């Protein structure tokens, strides 16, 4: 993996299977977490959706806040929403962009787990720098100890709660809430997932 890109095999999967993934994710989106996220924001001026994927969250947020920046390395994903109002799409990895205190919130729903650990930490720092003071960061990620490729070729680097919590605090975040839930993957396999809400100090 190059220093500024997601795993190429993973991106190719989403480019090739974007319609199937969009349909699956639509059926599995309730917007409960998005509503919680919005309720915790100090202000609702601008949000960045890191690894926006199918764009369901970006579209939902775009109706609630002034501006959404939807970021994803898959051009097939960003093409689906690039002409919608209040959404600015960027086809790139979080590792290749730089923002300074312009977003009130950052939303990364199961996207950073496609990065190696060291790149996850780099992405978290980029997100931290992109947030205004007291900005809110949501991170959804699979819980686990070992990285792997699934049967579809996607790279997964799940994390242990304590290790990830320590990493976020080291960067400068204050943890507001962490919950662990059981779920099913795109392949319908049982998984554990973490929902993490933290604030920029």
For each predicted feature, which ranges?
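Conserved acidic residues
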Residues: 104
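A conserved beta-strand element that flanks and buttresses the S-adenosyl-L-methionine
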Residues: 107
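Short catalytic micro-motifs in class I SAM-dependent methyltransferases
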Residues: 110-111
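Helix-to-beta-strand junctions that scaffold the AdoMet/dcAdoMet cofactor pocket
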Residues: 115-116, 131-133
């Amino acid at each position: 993996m190059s220093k500024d890109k997601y795993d190429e095999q993973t991106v190719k999967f989403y480019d090739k299977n974007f319609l199937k993934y969009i349909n699956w994710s639509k059926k599995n989106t309730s917007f409960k977490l998005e509503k919680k996220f919005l309720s915790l924001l100090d202000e609702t001026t601008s949000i960045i959706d890191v690894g926006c994927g199918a764009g369901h969250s970006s579209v939902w947020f775009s109706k609630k806040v002034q501006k959404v920046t939807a970021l994803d390395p898959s051009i097939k994903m960003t093409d689906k929403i690039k002409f919608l109002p209040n959404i600015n799409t960027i086809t790139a990895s979080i590792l290749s962009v730089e923002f300074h205190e312009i977003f009130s919130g950052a939303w990364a729903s199961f996207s950073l787990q496609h990065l190696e650990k060291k790149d996850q930490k780099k992405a978290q720092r980029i997100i931290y720098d992109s947030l205004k003071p007291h900005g809110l960061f949501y991170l959804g990620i699979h819980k686990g100890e070992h990285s792997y490729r699934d049967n579809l070729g996607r790279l997964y680097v799940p994390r242990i709660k304590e290790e990830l919590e320590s990493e976020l605090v080291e960067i400068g975040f204050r943890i507001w809430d962490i919950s662990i839930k059981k779920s099913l993957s795109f392949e319908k396999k049982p998984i554990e997932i973490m929902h993490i809400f933290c604030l920029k100090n």
